[in-house]
Amino acid sequence: MEKYDVAIIGGGSAGLAALKQLSTLGKQAVLLEAGEKVGVKNISGGILYSKKPNNGRVYNVEDIYGQNFVNEAPLQRKITQYLLHATSKDKVFSMDLTAAHEYQSNFGYSVLMNELNAWFAQSADESAQKSGGGIVPGVHVNDISWDAEKERTTIQTDEIDEFQVKAVIAADGVNSEVAQITNARPKFSATQLYQGVKAVVKLPENVINDTFAIGTDSGAAHLFAGDITLNHLGGGFLYTNRDTLSVGAVYHFDSLLD
């Protein structure tokens, strides 16, 4: 039976960061991704931040993927404007929150996660293979069992032979199947969840620049609150990408059930 130091379940940004960091530390780690290709299930997009708090320690993306991350990764636009719009019928009150967002911050870039996660995966897989691990796509975990005497965990899947690890990282999202299989936590209730809906609108780069009064190397983030949510608890967002807009809304799940 194959043995590894760590099994990571889920090929999103969290799982890939874990694989990259563990491999850099010399651990033999394997990442199992249910999708046929890393990134195909990641349709989200937002703003990726790098922070520098005055107190405490934050491990940023460039700490894991290298200080040249900004120049190498498929980022969209550096966000240089942050605006909050409060709506009420035919009135809008706008506030500039740029200074607050830039406080103790290195940068914020708009991103499309299907593109960025593919880049994360290539970098993480290269590091993992050097340590005897790697990424295995198209694999669904169906059982996880713990042997206290051997201090080993056995991973069983639908597609490949079972194998053993010393530790498991559940990085398979908010509806984690690993958490359900292992009873690590109960299912979330509607009061604990938000539902997001996003559309990507294709526009010429120069139209985006002119419409939002930004340059080619800058971007804008617009947040919306008020009656735009039609009496539901939530808010809206609009982020400028290179030649698209990410537009959507996020609602408190239980407010959608009323």
Residues covered by each model-derived region:
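Conserved Rossmann-like nucleotide-cofactor binding loop
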Residues: 14, 37, 175
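Cofactor-binding loop segments of dinucleotide-utilizing enzymes, especially the Rossmann-like FAD-
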Residues: 11, 34, 252
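Short beta-strand to alpha-helix junction loop
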Residues: 102-122, 258
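Low-complexity, highly charged intrinsically disordered N-terminal segments
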Residues: 95-99, 195-197
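N-terminal FAD cofactor-binding segment of flavoenzymes
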Residues: 35-89
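N-terminal Rossmann-like FAD-binding beta1-loop-alpha1 element of flavoenzymes
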Residues: 2-30
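Predominantly flavin-linked oxidoreductase catalytic cores and closely associated redox partners
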Residues: 123-258
